[in-house]
């Protein structure tokens, strides 16, 4: 099993979950979430989190238009 790929899948799931929480108006402290990550993983995680936040906001805007 590729542990690196598994770790990225886990980080992606967490980024999506925290972005969903943010979209629901729940407080998310990304600095606390990423505090123990090394720089490479933190950068990747924050980019994925930002991407998911953007996607969820666009989805919400489309839902409000219809």
UniProtKB/Swiss-Prot annotation:
A single BP term in Gene Ontology: negative regulation of bacterial-type flagellum-dependent cell motility
Pfam families to which the protein is assigned, alphabetical: GlgS (PF08971)
Source species, domain of life: Bacteria
Family designation: Belongs to the GlgS family.
Reported function: Major determinant of cell surface composition. Negatively regulates motility, adhesion and synthesis of biofilm exopolysaccharides.
This protein's name: Surface composition regulator
Species for this entry: Escherichia coli O45:K1 (strain S88 / ExPEC)
UniProt lineage: Bacteria, Pseudomonadati, Pseudomonadota, Gammaproteobacteria, Enterobacterales
């Amino acid at each position: 099993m590729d542990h690196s790929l598994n770790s990225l899948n886990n980080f992606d799931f967490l980024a999506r979950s925290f972005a969903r929480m943010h979209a629901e108006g729940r407080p998310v402290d990304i600095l606390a979430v990423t505090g123990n990550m090394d720089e490479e993983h933190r950068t990747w995680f924050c980019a994925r989190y930002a991407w998911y936040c953007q996607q969820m906001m666009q989805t919400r805007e489309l839902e409000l238009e219809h």
